[in-house]
């Protein structure tokens, strides 16, 4: 189940109660607070989480299955000092997310809209074919760009000998969150490419509608 977390002007997605994650699954209130704190550079002890007009309260071991969450529910983060603002590794990840990964999501959204527009069939067939070829290049280039971001994140030196263990854990979790987000976009983009290729096959007469 996905939750939309809003902190200041930034929104992130957190997957909860995902059995496929195994030991890394977020299933308790404490785990949810830790993930949100790591993703948003706030202090888990002082922040407050607002859900449907009420603050989420309870011990760390409270199961999230007992809370009335629904798909894409919104959680608003309030308070919480910048506990990790001075850590160079965490700051590096936050800056990379702000200046690169938000643009990656926007690029995917544009490609998704363009493919949907093409499928409506408002253009004459020759123009549809031309537009489809251009879109195919853009969608394939998205994969290349996303892979480069994965390589960059993997190569970042976010932990040094002087990094405290707790901070090192948070830095790793933050990088994992960013990588998981990119991999999700890659999976969605692969599905979009298959969808586009199928439509192009219909246009070219290889597949009958």
From Swiss-Prot:
Complex formation: Homodimer or homotetramer.
Function: May inhibit the chaperone activity of HSP70/HSC70 by promoting substrate release in an ATP-dependent manner.
GO biological process: protein stabilization
Pfam families, per database record: BAG, ubiquitin
Notes concerning its domains: The BAG domain probably mediates direct interaction with HSP70.
Signal peptide: none
GO molecular function: adenyl-nucleotide exchange factor activity; ATPase activator activity; protein-folding chaperone binding
Protein name as annotated: BAG family molecular chaperone regulator 1
Tagged with keyword Cytoplasm: no
Highest taxon, organism lineage: Eukaryota
Keywords on record: Chaperone
Domain named BAG: residues: 107-193
Keyword Chaperone among UniProt keywords: yes
Organism for this UniProt entry: Caenorhabditis briggsae
Ranges of residues in domain Ubiquitin-like: 7-84
CC terms in the record's Gene Ontology section: cytoplasm; cytosol; membrane; nucleus
